[in-house]
Amino acid sequence: MTKTYYFIGIKGTGMGPLAQILHDQGNTVLGSDIDSYTYTQAPLEAAGIKILPFSADNVDRYADAIFVRGNAFNDDHVEVQRALTLGVKMISYPDAVQEQIAQTTSIAVAGAHGKTSTTGLLAHVVKNIAPTSYLIGDGTGRGVPNSQFFVVEADEYRRHFKDYAPDYAILTNIDFDHPDYYEDINDVTRAFSDFANHVKKDIFAWGDDPYLRLLQPKADVYYYGTNSEQDDFVATNIRKSTQGSHFDVVFRGQSLGEFSVPLFGQHSILNALSVIAVAYMEKMDLSLIKSFLMTYQGVKRRFSEKQIADITVIDDYAHHPTEIDATLDAARQKYPNKQIIAIFQPHTYSRVIAYKDEFAKSLEAADKVYLANIFGSAREKQGAVTSAEIGAEISKFGGIIEEDNMSLLMPYENAVMVFMGAGDIEKYEFAYEKLLGQLRTDLQ
């Protein structure tokens, strides 16, 4: 029996994919959000899903629908307030996700870093082997009626994942990435412990993470990594090239064969290893796993590349020092003979205050560094720190860029420009690309 769902905040990076899933499953889906364009709305529009501006009248008009409430919306939001007044059926985003988890063999991917890339890779492999629905944090969702598997990105922010009860879970790492919510790393670890205790079958955790080693869930834990003395699934004989990464996999002394991924950086090998581990334990054909790993093309805003004349532009969501390390490492592997120029927009004042020194250290891996001003959030409009303070600690700092003045970036030729950030770094990237395209055309 099909239903009608109304999403309050339908353009959210989780809400959009969930809306797509429910639509694909034959339900009537619509929702509301802000007017300004976001990259998550394109697939919604392509599916014919109606997007309305926020209005209390929407609730009156669709009062018979099931309302899905986005995590960002409090009781005083105009539509939430009206829904509460009318007493319509309203469920939270996590509750709606859990409904999908409960219907299939479910695999959740959680971690401070790497969860979107890992979820995307896992979904790609599994969907090509068996009927699979998936929800990825880059705004991508797909619903398949009578799915055998459901692959989902599980977000730890504000403990959104705490009530998920998947069959399997991949835990990529634990880190203090949300200082605006969590008290400290111990608080984050407690949240992951709560989540892990809901996993029904097996957990696959990165073996080098000391906080993941502290977890004592009811489910069996298989550690993956590069240490044959402590890990269950081990990547050995690692070879990195400008075409990708290659490695052998051993499970508790048993060789599973050689694998390759068209991805770059040590983190990509670990992500792929976790996917191999889950698929192997679900008794999927190893030859199929190998084949589909090689055809993966990535997810949005994770090392996304484009070429403009002699310049390679990379767009990445990296907004934490660990993620910057991984992105610049990947750029070095793929482009070992080119200048790597980092353009970074810090995200939230609380994160910059917590990691100012670490940001500077991570960015030193680039040949030159440029910063945009800090992107705040709905909860943090301003703070007692600036991007210039990060720049002052970077020996290769080139200056602060402005959207209407890209002159600092224009002298580079045959270089790799790496734009990183979780705010609106894309507007700087687009401004640079537009000017670069004009200048290169004029020179021809």
From Swiss-Prot:
One of its GO terms (molecular function) is UDP-N-acetylmuramate-L-alanine ligase activity. It is found in: Cytoplasm. It catalyses: UDP-N-acetyl-alpha-D-muramate + L-alanine + ATP = UDP-N-acetyl-alpha-D-muramoyl-L-alanine + ADP + phosphate + H(+). Pfam families: Mur_ligase (PF01225), Mur_ligase_C (PF02875), Mur_ligase_M (PF08245). This is UDP-N-acetylmuramate--L-alanine ligase. SUPFAM superfamilies: MurCD N-terminal domain, MurD-like peptide ligases, catalytic domain, MurD-like peptide ligases, peptide-binding domain. The lineage of its organism: Bacteria, Bacillati, Bacillota, Bacilli, Lactobacillales. GO terms for biological process: cell division; cell wall organization; peptidoglycan biosynthetic process; regulation of cell shape. Cell wall formation. Pathway: Cell wall biogenesis; peptidoglycan biosynthesis. Its EC number is 6.3.2.8.
